[in-house]
């Protein structure tokens, strides 16, 4: 039972492998978000492709509010670099410190030129060695491939500063029965399945994105497919993040596809 992002990666990899049989495509990043998704090996060398959902989050970094100096500090734990685009965002937020420092879990929109957000995304993925992006347009059942520098033409990008939990993990074995009993008590549970460290719950579709707070910890139900959910334990650590959300706005440009195909020779 694959998660949505993994299923999209697998579908894109299969599509590329079937359409361009003379080229070697291989899954590369897998669940490691610091690495590109697909490696392409041609007779002239290799490059990478990043897979993106047509509506998704695409990058983030932590900014820590300094109440004394009324500035935002770039966290040393960020996986991205403090580049020119990051500095522009920080400078903007510093000018409105009292407004942004109150951001909660709903977040506050960054009212800045979209080109800054798209620029951050392009520079971040260029640093990972990404040359092309691939996405799937559900509206017309079309795979779309375009070069990194065209990201802002294909996706609209919004920036937001909000507080979120720092991550999640598969729930420990000792917590599984507790979560199952809670789902049963609400009449939403049908069955469960364990695959390695992963707990899947089969139940009512209303479980999607449901969060249970049990013994001081939060457990969230991530939808895998209709009626099937992967349960994860949320971290108790909160960070305030600048987050970029993307939304597909353009169909395939044939010249961009030809550019990709030329690089496969």
Q: What are these model-derived regions, one by one?
A:
Residues 211-265:
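Charge-dense, extended regions
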Residues 51-145, 149-162, 166-221, 225-226:
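Catalytic cores of nucleic-acid endonucleases
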